[in-house]
Structures are given as C-alpha cells and as structure tokens.
Regions:
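Helix N-cap/loop-to-helix boundary motif
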Residues: 80-84, 123-124, 164-171
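Alpha-helical segment of the N-proximal tetratricopeptide repeat
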Residues: 38-77
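Residue at a conserved register position within TPR or TPR-like alpha-solenoid repeats
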Residues: 55, 90, 97, 117, ...
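Amphipathic alpha-helical segments of tetratricopeptide repeats
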Residues: 72-77, 111-118, 134-135, 154-159
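Low-complexity, proline/glycine-enriched flexible segments
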Residues: 1-44
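TPR repeat positional signature
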Residues: 48-51, 68, 90-93, 110, ...
Length: 192
C-alpha cells in the first residue's frame, strides 16, 4: 500500500463549534419556554424572558425592546449588572436592538457584555458577544462611524485572540474584520 496505517496519524475528528453570538440568542428565543424546562428550577428572570421571547416570536419587536430594557434595569438593580442572568438578558436586549434596526445600540451592548464576560474569565461567552458585536458592526453603513466602532471591536477581539480560547481558534473571522476596516477606511477617505 501507499500508506502504512501503522505510521500515519489519523485525522482528528472535527471539533463541534457551538452556536455563538446572535445565532445562540436566536436559538434561545425560538426554543422552549424557560419556565417549562424539565428538571430545572426556572431562574428569577424566566417569566420576563418568556414574555420578551413571545413578543419577538410574534414580531412585536418594539414591545420586546421595551420589555427587555425594563427587565434589564430591574434585574441589574436587584442582581447587579454583571450577574450571569443579567448578562444573558443584556445579550437578548442587544439581539432585539439589532432586530429593531439599531445596530449601533446592539454593538455597544454586545461589546459591554463581552467585556464583562472577559473580566469574569469566560472566554467562550466573551467571544460569542464579540461575534454579536461584529454582526451589528457590519450593519453600520456610515464609514466613519464604522471605523470608530471597528477600532473598539478589534481592540477587544485582538486581546481575546492573544489570550487563547475560541477567539484564537478562529483567526479567519478576525482577518475578515480587519479587511472590512480597510474597506471602511477607503470609503471614509472618499467621503471626507
């Protein structure tokens, strides 16, 4: 035979990539009602989150946005802004802002949540929120604003990539964002 099976290294099995960013949030919104999870005690935000999800599923994005903002305010006051459930709620609020056509707000909320997760040492969640911020950033059409937001995004993204974890394992996404920055710089130069 051409290859001796005893001396060849088997191909590593492909690594499962979890849903990240707004994809993960969308899966949660479209998934089961958090109040009805089998064997799991619903958290204190299960009821409000279920109502927000119902509004999103029904296409009532303005209602969902209002509910999310009020719930974030109330939950932050009760639990603290960096409590895990509040962070998940803020991820949901960012997704709703994106659906509502407010990519700048979605960007800022996602990046703030990414920073909180990084500070807590959760690189997977931090990178997921960087991905959400990147999705929102790509929806910003004004080149100068896109450059400003992109600088902020790439700063955190590069830091996460140098620290290892999922951001380091996905260099093509970061390279793609850097390429977009080049295109934005070219467009901004024409606009000025």
């Amino acid at each position: 035979p051409l290859l001796d099976p005893a001396t060849t290294t088997p191909e590593p099995s492909p690594k499962h990539t979890p849903a990240r960013g707004f994809d993960a949030v969308a899966e949660a919104v479209l998934g089961d009602d958090p109040r009805e999870a089998d064997g799991v005690e619903p958290g204190p935000l299960a009821g409000p989150v279920a109502r927000i999800n119902e509004a999103v599923r029904a296409g009532r994005i303005d209602t969902a946005a209002g509910l999310a903002e009020q719930t974030v305010t109330d939950a932050s006051a009760a639990l603290g802004a960096d409590h895990p459930e509040v962070l998940r709620l803020r991820e949901l609020a960012a997704y709703i802002a994106y659906l509502a056509g407010d990519p700048v707000r979605a960007f800022h909320v996602s990046l703030d949540v990414a920073r909180a997760h990084r500070h807590a040492g959760d690189t997977e969640a931090a990178y997921g929120n960087v991905q959400s911020a990147a999705t929102a950033w790509r929806a910003v059409r004004e080149p100068v604003q896109g450059l400003n937001l992109g600088n902020e995004l790439l700063g955190l993204w590069t830091t996460l990539a140098t620290e290892g974890g999922p951001a380091a394992e996905d260099p093509t996404a970061l390279d793609s964002a850097r390429s977009r920055m080049q295109r934005l710089a070219e467009r901004a130069a024409v606009v000025r």
